[in-house]
Amino acid sequence: MNWTWFHKLGSPKWFYEISGRWLPWFAIGAALLITVGTVWGLAFAPPDYQQGNSFRIIYIHVPAAFLAQSCYVMLAVCGVVGLVWKMKLADVALQAAAPVGAWMTFIALVTGAIWGKPTWGAWWVWDARLTSMLILLFLYFGVIALGQAISNRDSAAKACAVLAIVGVINIPIIKYSVEWWNTLHQPATFTVTEKPAMPAEMWVPLLLMVLGFYCFFGAVVLMRMRLEVLRREARAAWVRNEVKALVEKAS
């Protein structure tokens, strides 16, 4: 197996160049998928036979919850790569993704509360799924706070990596909480291995929204990583040339 691509990821210059090609595709994909998914889900999907139109918040809640968990797994992977292979771009990715993951967790909690009020009769209950998602938000806050509180970049990277790796144990708890404990939450809306329980008119726009959220995540994280690479490599000749070219292009 050719691992050249993996070793190239250790080069900030190579990453900056290749990410510039990926970024527009992620942005375009996010715009198209989210637009189509939102219009289809809110305007054309039929109402649920039990929940009526209140179920439509699923088109925001489920993608945000999926992305919140996936993002934290990414943080843990970046932590392992940073600790084992000493790849500085892993810390760049970790720091760039953490705030996005925190926002997605917050959105999932807020939309869940809005959905829960007409469904359960309460904005919040100490349900296993809700509690573990709240813990996930605090884990994100911890990673962000550690990254900003420790002035030494290497020490901050190690501390954030360790917290991300330790905290990833919360992800299977979130996923399987509805099976391990008696919770108010329903099982997964759809999975890769099973046919969705809802009709295609409902789950297709949901799938589009999930894919759109992931494209949005990719675009935002790449933008944040590119800015951080420029900041950290500010003294490098290639960065000065890049900034000079951008200034000349803008003027």
Regions found by a protein language model. Name each.
Residues 1-251:
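Polytopic transmembrane helical bundles with strong interfacial aromatic enrichment
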